[in-house]
Amino acid sequence: MRANNLTLLTDLYELTMMQGYFKNPTDQIVVFDMFYRDNPCGGGFAICAGLEQVIEYIENLRFTDADIEYLRGLSIFEEDFLEYLRSFHFTGDIYAIPEGTVIFPREPMVKVVAPIMEAQLVETAILNIMNHQSLIATKAARVCYAAKGDGIMEFGLRRAQGPDAGIFGARAAVIGGCVGTSCVLTGQMFDVPVLGTHAHSWIMSFPDEYTAFKTYARMYPDACILLVDTYDVLKSGVPNAIRVFEEMREEGIQLKKYGIRIDSGDLAYLSKEAYKMLSAAGFDDATISASSDLDEYLIESLKAQDAKINSWGVGTRLITSNDNPAFGGVYKLAAVKNPETGEFVPKIKLSENTAKVTNPGNKTVYRIYSKSTGKIKADLICLADEKLNPDETMVVFDPVDTWKKTKILGGTYEVRELLVPVIKEGKRVYTSPSVMELRAICQQEQSTLWDESRRFSNPQKVYVDLSPKLYQVKKELIEEMSRKDLEFEEE
């Protein structure tokens, strides 16, 4: 981990391109969009996360003497360029979708408007930060949805792909819905609840399980969750836990947050049997927590089996997004400003794969909500100077399958612009909510989705459409590029 200054958190080619621009001077102001193409885990949406760390990265973006010396030692960069880097700082604008927001493929999550050297340099770090945290926040949202209101504890630090992945992955997991994390440093840095019980080693270090439970319970009577699977859940663990709870009750010690945790075995069967035993002893309000390689699919299955579990510790498969370990965000040039007219000239990247053809121009994104339900009807990508009037009827259509059209009657919908300014002329203009506030925002955001878009198997797609004006720009650019290709072939 390198605190604050992450300027060299970049791919080498960003710096070699910067030197190329420097040696061939240009005053070009450009627009780059960060977006992704496919929802993680085959889901119906993603959660935007990582923006605060992007802002902090921009605020601390400067080359130190040590950075310059290292770059000089690569024998790639010339002295006049290295001297330029000494005074480098970001002067552009950044717009972004706020953290905790539900997002969909192809819409810009982050838009950078800056001199081309600056916009090029920040590509790698923006992708690194946003891809990671958006992935984990999305996975957490899925896991929490499967739990149907039960608390999900993020327990993945020891299995995370290094310290930063553990710290910031836990941050993202809380944004996505987790009630807290086992990572104490994340708790300190972001003021989120830290949670935990004890390990099997605690039990094994005592002469017997009962003594281990009793000692722990006396030390932590207000947070007494006992791990019952060290030896035998039903023959030893649960009976010894009940014995300790009964002794505390007889002594007048108020049991607040108490219960058991099961970390192995048939969680459905064991939880149901443990619940019967606890209830018979008068402890039917005890927490029954489960861990053991959980994810949204296993939790959903356990819920369907009526497992008596009401608290879940999820580690490896959350902090690594085990079944979908990469978010897939990309960063593409979308427009170049004409210095004479001040207008942005749209740029497009073509591909034989139509899904990889970029959307050109300086753009913004509008979310369209149904007035009657509050649910999302569609997202609309527009050119930045376009405004939507919710009193007017509009027709939106799929940018790939253009025959798929939907008419939205005026007066039946509300509109929200998703991209907000976070950096203007190199300075922060945005105050991020706290992580716990972002968690609440994320939960509210997910309530605007239909359940059909949240299911894990074949979710209903939320359409991200292009405005007619933007679609026409894209169509004309594709036709223009096609003509140039034909002219080249004829030559």
Which residues fall in each region the model found?
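Gly/Ser/Thr/Ala-enriched C-terminal appendages of enzymes
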Residues: 1-28, 32, 37, 41-43, ...
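An N-terminal, globular interaction/scaffold subdomain
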Residues: 56-60, 96-99, 103
